[in-house]
Regions:
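A nucleotide- and high-energy phosphate-metabolite-utilizing enzyme signature
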Residues: 1-267
Length: 267
């Protein structure tokens, strides 16, 4: 199960009819067993909150029309994009990368953990989402093919982004099926079943579970490469230097020591 976040968008202040309609909708979704996050706002209220709260700014970047007055939805999207033009892209990027650093500190700084966190770990889904949010804010694009058209990614990188995204979502869905509940950590005891479900058979000298985990770590590394590539573009094209981007890029720098290579403090 995953959370569903809904914004009930009002053309004016809430009326008794609107309140009843929203309440009935929520009860219906709760009866289905869904976990629903929800907010009820007018366009002006949404824009005001977006200016004050980075979490709301981010969530509204992903907003899409589901049902109701489509003209109101279009008006909201137009007004929201105009609001973004007045906000600092450097500050938004700084906030997203700060969140990424804090998240990975909690989940584990290495992408090669024995029990990786597929959502919040290094090279996980949230890293790809963070890249999409930053490019959406700065360049009005969040999908790999659009990033290619805007010159943010080359063709191979665009293909890699989509491949990584599809793989990680597939693994996450299977993980939820195996655990029979929301779960983000690929536990050691579940990895063999995961490999079997995803079609990783044993081969000479290599177990299916080993093949699966090798593939997972390869994907996580490719997500890291995408992060470096997009961050370098952002730093180059944003006029204001962003400290966290410089820090993120420095992580990938290598230093040769006699007989070894040091990469981000690791041998």
């Amino acid at each position: 199960q995953s959370d569903i976040d809904l914004l009930f968008l009002l053309p004016y202040k809430k009326t008794a009819w609107a309140e009843a309609a929203i309440e009935n909708t929520l009860y219906f979704l709760w009866d289905l067993g869904l976990k629903v996050g929800q907010a009820t706002r007018s366009i002006s209220e949404s824009l005001l909150l977006a200016e004050k709260d980075q979490t709301i700014t981010t969530s509204m970047l992903d907003a899409r029309h589901l049902w109701g007055n489509e003209e109101l939805s279009k008006s909201f999207k137009k007004s929201y994009r105009e609001k973004l033009e007045t906000m600092s892209s450097a500050d938004f990027i700084q906030a997203k990368l700060d969140e990424r650093e804090e998240r990975q500190h909690k989940a584990g700084q290495s992408r090669y953990l024995v029990e990786p966190n597929i959502k919040n770990g290094k090279g996980g889904l949230r890293d790809l989402e963070t890249l999409s949010w930053m490019t959406n804010f700065c360049y009005k694009c969040s999908r790999p093919d659009d990033m290619f058209k805007k010159g943010i990614l080359n063709k191979d990188e665009s293909t890699t982004f989509l491949k990584c995204e599809n793989f990680l979502w597939h693994v996450r869905c299977q993980l939820h099926y195996i655990a029979k509940r929301p779960e983000e950590v690929i536990n050691f005891n579940d990895q063999r079943e995961m490999a079997k479900r995803l079609g990783y058979d044993d081969r000479k000298g290599l177990l299916g579970v080993e093949r699966f985990m090798r593939h997972y770590f390869l994907i996580a590394r490719e997500v890291g490469d995408l992060t470096r590539s997009i961050c370098s573009i952002l730093e180059e094209q944003q006029k204001k230097s962003i400290p966290v981007i410089s820090k993120a890029l420095s992580y990938f720098s290598e230093e040769k020591v006699e007989g070894f290579i040091l990469n981000a403090g690791r041998i």
